[in-house]
């Protein structure tokens, strides 16, 4: 049984990475497509990544992208390797895509810190899986229907 789980993890990460290579590098598209495909193959893929100690989740009604970008640049300027979803999408699939881009085939993330911009609607389903060490809430307004 354990071999099947390991193969599923490896296969979903491999296919996600290949999708990232084809869609992202060759066609310059697909900010979330690799994550969508990997998630379809393995609904628990977020559990399969070995994240660094510092995982920062940025959420809120507005200002998430700017805050994430500023934080990532600060960490980079301090010499840290940073994994973050910088392609403009803040859904679960985009977080998975950024992890696929910055991890080895065994799921170990090759960064010192992860900073994830995430839509406030997805935070509840993502937090238990990535277990952020820090959470930044930019603001809370009623800008979208529940």
Q: Which residue stretches match the model-derived regions?
A:
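Phosphate-binding loop of NTP-binding sites
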Residues: 2-146
């Amino acid at each position: 049984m354990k071999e099947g789980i390991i193969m599923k993890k490896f296969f979903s990460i491999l296919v996600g990475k290949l999708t990232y290579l084809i869609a992202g590098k060759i066609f310059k598209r697909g900010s979330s497509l690799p994550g969508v495909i990997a998630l379809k193959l393995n609904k628990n893929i977020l559990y399969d990544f070995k994240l660094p100690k510092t995982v920062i989740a940025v959420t809120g009604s507005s200002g998430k992208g700017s805050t994430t970008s500023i934080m990532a640049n600060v960490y980079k300027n301090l010499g840290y390797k940073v994994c973050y979803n910088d392609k403009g999408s803040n859904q679960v699939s985009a977080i998975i895509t950024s992890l696929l881009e910055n991890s080895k085939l065994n799921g170990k993330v090759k960064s010192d810190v992860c900073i994830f911009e995430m839509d406030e609607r997805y935070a509840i389903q993502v937090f238990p899986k990535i277990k952020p060490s820090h959470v930044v809430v930019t603001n809370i307004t009623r800008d979208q229907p529940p």
